[in-house]
Design a protein with these regions (language model features):
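Conserved anchor residues at repeat-unit boundaries in beta-strand-based tandem repeats, strongest
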Residues: 1-11, 23-34, 46-57, 69-80, ...
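Short intrinsically disordered, low-complexity segments
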Residues: 34, 61-64, 88, 133, ...
């Protein structure tokens, strides 16, 4: 550890190099990470943001070695609250998270241009939502486990409209 000490505790600004190669640079309070800091993982990942009593809690940015990036709220070290995740392939999710899982309201845009906006549960569209395909096909209605389910309306680019029940993504 290189930094400020108060009564044999890390307190203030400092840098700690872990045995596994990880490194933390930032604020300390009562010998734990507390305040603003940057954590460099030996894997190549990086977190920059708020810490509360040694845990990523508050606003932060987590950048993965592969280029994936999350910007938003953290709670107890997990992506929880409002946030945006951008995958290295160009896909983007903006919305609510619970423990690193898309849950609540959100919008996901695939790299191919397809887009879903609505309810999420267990990392999948689940509840009410709108799916707009890159070819212009649009579905508005129920979803379950990532597929069209229940009552809904589908409109094709040619103007064909189907209103009725869907089961596992089929009319």
């Amino acid at each position: 550890y290189n930094g400020d000490w108060v009564a044999d505790s890390r307190e203030g600004k400092g840098t700690f190099q872990y045995v596994n190669g990880d490194k933390y640079v930032g604020d300390w309070k009562a010998d734990v990470q507390h305040g603003k800091g940057i954590y460099y993982f030996s894997s190549g990942d990086r977190y920059e943001g708020d810490y509360v009593e040694g845990e990523r809690t508050g606003q932060g940015i987590y950048v993965h070695k592969n280029g994936d990036k999350y910007v938003g709220e953290f709670k107890s070290g997990e992506q929880s609250g409002q946030g945006t995740f951008t995958w290295s392939n160009g896909a983007v999710y903006e919305g609510q998270w619970i423990d690193n899982v898309r849950s609540g309201k959100g919008r996901y845009k695939w790299a191919n241009g397809d887009e879903y906006e609505g309810d999420w549960k267990n990392d999948m569209p689940d509840g009410e939502g709108v799916l707009t395909m890159a070819d212009g096909t649009r579905y508005k209605g129920g979803f379950s486990k990532g597929m069209e389910e229940g009552k809904g309306v589908m409109l094709t680019p040619e103007g064909i409209r189907f209103e009725g029940s869907f089961k596992q993504g089929k009319k």
